[in-house]
């Protein structure tokens, strides 16, 4: 498994990025979005790191990047609008680099809102993965309408997004879909970030878009 430091083109300037590459030929390309920038979220957040490593272990090539204004990425916080454009730029980069691979949209917290929303509307993306999605704070309208496979991982004791709200959101989603609840985990999965990786491996090791 190798990790390549990259700078990818963004809508208003370069975006700092890391490309995690598996051993052997990759089977899918994942674009992973980090949590809320104004609350300290970056592509190095523990859950993002653990998720990326888990996905590379099961054969995915994973692009994680810093939204505008984070780290060495150009620009400044844009209340989600510009961050959507950043994610689209990351999708364009991966589609150009890996044109023959399935593309999966994934993100943690605020990043799940960005990734799943863009992924639901982009025909190049065939799978939506959300970790601790803030469904009580953002509209996931496109995701609710989408028939693409959806995978959600959430903490049982999330203090910001109650599990009840996520279960209600999940009930509104079209099949195929799967929800994994991690016992005792809070919103940041403190002390349990590796369990997020374990959950993704269990959900996605044998998954391909063609099988759904």
What is each of the regions a protein language model found here?
Residues 1-25:
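N-terminal cap/lid segment of alpha/beta-hydrolase-fold proteins
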Residues 23-64:
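Short, surface-exposed "cap/lid" segments of acyl-processing enzymes
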Residues 77-97:
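Alpha/beta-hydrolase active-site loop
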Residues 107-115:
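Gly/Ala-rich beta-loop-alpha elbow adjacent to hydrolase catalytic centers
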Residues 146-147, 151-154, 158:
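Short beta-strand/loop motif that positions the catalytic acidic residue
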Residues 157-161, 188:
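Acidic catalytic loop of the alpha/beta-hydrolase fold
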Residues 172-188:
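Catalytic histidine neighborhood in serine/cysteine hydrolases
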Residues 185-197:
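Catalytic histidine-centered segment of alpha/beta-hydrolase-like enzymes
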């Amino acid at each position: 498994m190798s990790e390549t430091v990259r700078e990818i083109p963004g809508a208003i300037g370069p975006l700092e990025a890391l490309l995690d590459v598996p051993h052997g030929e990759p089977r899918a390309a994942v674009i992973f979005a980090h949590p809320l920038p104004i609350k300290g979220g970056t592509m190095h957040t523990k859950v993002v790191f653990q998720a990326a490593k888990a996905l590379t272990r099961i054969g995915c090539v994973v692009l994680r990047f810093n939204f505008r204004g984070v780290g060495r990425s150009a620009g400044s916080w844009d209340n989600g609008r510009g961050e959507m454009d950043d994610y689209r730029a990351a999708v364009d980069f991966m589609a150009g680099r890996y044109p023959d691979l399935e593309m999966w949209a994934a993100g943690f917290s605020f990043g799940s809102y960005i990734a799943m929303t863009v992924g639901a509307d982009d025909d190049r993306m065939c799978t939506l993965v959300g970790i601790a999605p803030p469904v009580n704070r953002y509209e996931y309208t496109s995701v609710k309408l989408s028939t693409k496979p959806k995978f959600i991982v959430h903490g049982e004791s999330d203090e910001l997004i109650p599990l009840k709200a996520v279960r209600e959101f999940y009930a509104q989603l079209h099949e195929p879909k799967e929800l994994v609840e991690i016992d005792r985990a809070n919103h940041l999965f403190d002390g349990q970030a590796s369990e997020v990786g374990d959950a993704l491996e269990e959900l996605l090791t044998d998954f391909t878009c063609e099988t759904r």
